């Protein structure tokens, strides 16, 4: 098949091109002419020592950012960005708001960080403490004495920044570390204690410029649900709860988390993922009939709770608080372990695709 051209139109265009621009006539403006010029220096902290610096909300707005050769600094990026690289930094405290792509630490030592990103990687780093939210499996390479905890932070603009970065607050693999260069007989990474307090590692900003950001490190206010991760579970009883897509899915999940944690259960892990009918058949088995139409509306949100009486407690809260909402909850202690394994094995495969 060919393309059609108009000779008449071509002659007209040629005649228009041949006509000189009239005096005083404004030249044509194109979208790329109007695009605001970006100065890389506005998106970089380099060579700083003994300083507190940062970027306020809306001052990075999805651009790439670079931090390099800083020593004994407090650095706060209170905005979403595309990617961030941190090179050759020593004894720094760093907060990084949601990063759409990767965060890469290289040749850093004795740093304490709070980071939210899609991909996290370190190379040639030593003695770092990281409170992390990461959508994919974090990777360390040629790095030692690395410690990880779950992201816990709040300021009013943070939830919207997660959305602008395309990150789900419910997909966090902070504790599932892959050591790209393991050494036999040595452990290059570990998990921070569950009661670790962020402010003991990274102070809240105290400069006049940054104090206007209403920051809280209170675990109960955290945008990201604080999970137990891959630490040894306190009990051999877990329960799987799955909310299906709707107008209040995330809000319902947060309410469920608050209820169960308030009852003394541990939130082990969360996941937001799309499911096909064949996936649901493998995960939910005999309970699929009423779920088919719900799967077509969007991703599901799964929560694993752990503790004595977890199944009974979850069923009670679901019946009393979410009676008008379709929710999957494990039927018994015996089936719950299978439910958790089936769902998260499926979810891990989906996230790895």
UniProtKB/Swiss-Prot annotation:
Lipid attachment in record (N-myristoyl glycine): 2
Region (Disordered): 1-37
Lipid positions (S-palmitoyl cysteine): 3
Location of the C-CAP/cofactor C-like domain: 27-182
GO molecular function: GTP binding; GTPase activator activity
InterPro entries the record matches: C-CAP_CF_C-like, CAP/MinC_C, CAP_C_sf, CARP_motif, NDK-like_dom_sf, Tubulin-bd_cofactor_C_dom, XRP2
Positions of GTP binding: 101-102, 118-121
Entry protein name: Protein XRP2
Species lineage: Eukaryota, Metazoa, Chordata, Craniata, Vertebrata
